[in-house]
């Protein structure tokens, strides 16, 4: 039976498996890329605030 234009085709088990695998890879990228990058950004902000607010000791 022909598919009509604009109507989405029914998802096969192969399509579902590929979609699940893609989601799993996306979750792995979150832990390997996003979290370390976020940690570096937070560390830079903390260092900047520390340097900007430390008392200057002039003798």
Curated annotation (Swiss-Prot):
Pfam families: DUF4519. Signal peptide: none annotated. It is a single-pass membrane protein. Residues 1-23 are annotated as: Disordered. The chain crosses the membrane at residues 32-52. It is found in: Membrane. One of its GO terms (cellular component) is membrane. Keywords: Coiled coil, Membrane, Transmembrane, Transmembrane helix. Residues 9-22 have a biased composition (Basic and acidic residues). Its main location: membrane. It comes from the Eukaryota. Residues 9-31 form a coiled coil. Belongs to the SMCO4 family. This is Single-pass membrane and coiled-coil domain-containing protein 4.
């Amino acid at each position: 039976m022909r598919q009509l234009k604009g109507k989405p085709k029914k998802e096969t088990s192969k399509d579902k498996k590929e979609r699940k695998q893609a989601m799993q890879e996306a979750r792995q990228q979150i832990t390997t890329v996003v979290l370390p990058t976020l940690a570096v950004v937070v560390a830079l902000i903390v260092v900047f605030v520390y340097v900007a607010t430390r008392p200057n000791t002039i003798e």
